[in-house]
Amino acid sequence: MKTSTIVRKSFAAGDMIRDAGLKTPEDVQRFDDIVYGEDKVWQSLDVYRPKATNIEEKLPVIVSVHGGGWVYGDKKLYQFYCMSLAQRGFAVVNFSYRLAPESKFPASIIDTDLVFGWILDHAEEYGFDTENIFAVGDSAGAHMLGLYTNLCTNPEYAKVYKEKFGIQTPQDLKIRAVALNCGQYHFGLEEMSNEMTDNLMKEFLPEGGTPEELGLVNVDTYVIEKFPPVYL
């Protein structure tokens, strides 16, 4: 049995218990299932705002990158967490992205980039303050967000991704700060000796985790001074 299958079954059982009986808070306004790419299922997002605010009122933005070992999860599983952030005065963007092994790296990074571009393009429509964009990532989402933040701040790293994958982050995007929860930020010999990590990387990466591939997804290697403030 694939590791991704095991992860999906085990994680789903716990998530169902956690979310049982939860409902949308009365003080949150939500805009659901907005398609940001070609895949209407996996490339979709929700926007949550405090209901007491007018849509014309620009609010600071929090972008949530969900976890799930790169192989599991979607925006539905993080909706209640994200709505709790909206209750604190933020416009929150909660998105699904394409998962491995069906969609190999860099699909999830491409999707993350599309979402940030979508935010800039729809700032007026949804009341986003693009001068105050923050982001949170959980587990695999923390790894992806760390990687993406490197692409936004490290020109040499960004050049590699542009040449290899055609990814180019929006020039006018500035992420003010990030919060990274329970992520893995380096994939060396010690880390890859963990059977689950090794198996997940084999499903996540197109060539199964060659040294070159692992080097490209190491977050800590490419952090420079321009990296924004981070809460770990």
Residue ranges and their predicted role:
Residues M1-L232:
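Alpha/beta-hydrolase superfamily serine-hydrolase fold, recognizing
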